[in-house]
Amino acid sequence: MRHYETMFILKPTLVEEEIKSKIEFYKEVITKHHGVIETSLDMGMRNLAYEIKKHKRGYYYVAYFKAEPSMILELERLYRINEDVLRFIVIKYESKKEVEAWHALVDRANKKPSHAKEKHEKTEHTHSHHLEEAESVGSHSE
């Protein structure tokens, strides 16, 4: 399975029940095709960067999931034929570095410290420890 992120923007004219229904529909598309949703972010109503189909606002939803590449075409097809979807994007994370970034995004969405941040903090701690040692050696030699 590959790592993906999808975001879609729904029309602002939908009522809460319709929004929930659309979100559940797309989540089911992923899971029915043996995908696994790791986490999702319900970002709510936001201003659009530019007007889309005469709308200045839209309802944003993001999901991070693992799935087989074959189901992505079906997901995109279903986005395209739904007139309530203003915009959508599906991003595939391929390289080791991209997959690490995907995990960091999932951790952030789940409010956990990310793997990448832990690595960075470890490196930063080691680096500052070496600087302290170098400074103490430098001050002793004077």
Swiss-Prot record:
InterPro entries: Ribosomal_bS6, Ribosomal_bS6_CS, Ribosomal_bS6_sf, Ribosomal_S6_plastid/chlpt, Transl_elong_EF1B/ribsomal_bS6. The keyword Ribosomal protein applies. GO terms for biological process: translation. Keywords: Ribonucleoprotein, Ribosomal protein, RNA-binding, rRNA-binding. One of its GO terms (cellular component) is cytosolic small ribosomal subunit. One of its GO terms (molecular function) is small ribosomal subunit rRNA binding. CDD domains: bS6. It holds the Pfam family Ribosomal_S6. Residues 110-142 are annotated as: Disordered. Residues 110-133 have a biased composition (Basic and acidic residues). Binds together with bS18 to 16S ribosomal RNA. Belongs to the bacterial ribosomal protein bS6 family. This is Small ribosomal subunit protein bS6. It comes from Helicobacter pylori (strain HPAG1).
